[in-house]
Structure formats: C-alpha cells, structure tokens
C-alpha cells in the first residue's frame, strides 16, 4: 500500500530531479522502483531488466522476521529489506553511498533472475560458504561469468561506487585495492551486452 502526501522541502538528487511528492510504504507491503533507482541500475544493466516488474518489499522475506540484520534477500526478482533497512528511494540525496552500492548488489540478483538464473537455488548453495562467497579476486584470465552470483553482485556494486559515485569508501568488497581499470576489464562483457546470458555465473 502506498500513501502519497504533499510535503514541503523535498530534496532532489543527481538521478531524479523535480520531485514534489514522497511515497511511504507500510511494513509488509512493497513499492515499485523509483525513477532515480532505475537510472542507477541503467548505468550497468541498461534495458536488460524489465524494471516495471521489480518490487521493493518492506519487511523480511522469511516468516517470523527471520531475515538477518543488514541483509537483503532477492530470490525471485524482487528485493526484500528488513523494516529498518528499507528506504523509499535508494537514489535520494540523503542516502548513504554504501546503501546505494548495496542496492546495486541486489539489482544484480534481479538481473540474474530475469535472465533465467535460479537465484533462490544457487543462493542456498553459494551463501553456505559464508563471507568467502562474497569475496572476489581479480585476475587477468577471469571475466564476469567466472564469478559466482554474490561475487557478481559485489563487482557491480564496487564498479558503481568507483565509476558512478566516484567514492572508494562506498565499495562493498573491503579487500579490493586494485585500479578502476581492473573492474572495467572484468565487467566489460556485461557492460557491452547485459542481455547476453553468457554473462551469468558458470
């Protein structure tokens, strides 16, 4: 359920200008992507995602609010954030850079799902490795499809942090100390043709 009320002093942002309304999503309900969020995702995924199909849920994906704190779940093409982590617009000027990167990580799972990748199933088999599942190492012989679903999410998030936000402090993979050109190399196949299913994890 969306409540839309007129308010004064709404901030604009670099992705969406001229907004005069603010949407409020009730816990247990969802909202569509904002225009600013779509612009964020477009910087990487272009038109490979049907953005109208994506919903952002306010509340745990799991029963009894069992979703871990500071954890989002995107198993079915929709994002599920705990109540305290949910934002009405991840592109807003007031949003922390790290949360924008987090949003891009989750959009990677949306992209994977819409291209036919079984995010729910592979999520069970990949995340069982714990933090190691998310950490990546860039090597000359590896390209985007050589990384698992969570590593891909972090690669996209860090690319966005460095190349779009231009803020190293917003990177998700804290072990990353390489040059921006290394991320360019790894993401090149995805950026060139985000509709190509060959970019999905092997």
Where are these regions (language model features)?
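Alpha-helical membrane-targeting segments
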Residues: 1-11, 61-70, 74-76, 116-133
């Amino acid at each position: 359920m969306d409540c839309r009320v007129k308010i004064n002093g709404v901030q604009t942002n670099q992705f969406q200008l001229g907004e005069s309304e603010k949407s409020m999503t009730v816990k247990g309900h969802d909202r569509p992507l904002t225009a600013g969020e779509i612009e964020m995702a477009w910087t990487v995924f272009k038109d490979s995602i049907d953005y109208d199909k994506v919903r952002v849920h306010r509340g745990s994906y799991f029963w009894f609010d069992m979703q871990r704190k500071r954890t989002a779940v995107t198993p079915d093409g929709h994002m599920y954030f705990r109540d305290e982590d949910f934002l009405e617009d991840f592109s807003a000027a007031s949003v922390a850079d790290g949360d924008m990167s987090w949003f891009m990580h989750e959009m990677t799972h949306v992209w994977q799902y819409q291209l036919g990748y079984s995010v729910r199933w592979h999520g069970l088999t990949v995340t069982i490795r714990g933090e190691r599942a998310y950490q990546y190492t860039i090597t000359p012989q590896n390209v985007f499809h050589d990384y698992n679903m969570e590593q891909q999410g972090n690669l996209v998030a860090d690319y966005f942090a460095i190349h779009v936000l231009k803020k190293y402090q917003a990177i998700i993979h804290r072990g990353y100390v390489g040059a921006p050109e290394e991320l360019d190399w790894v993401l090149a196949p995805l950026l060139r043709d985000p509709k190509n299913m060959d970019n999905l994890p092997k």
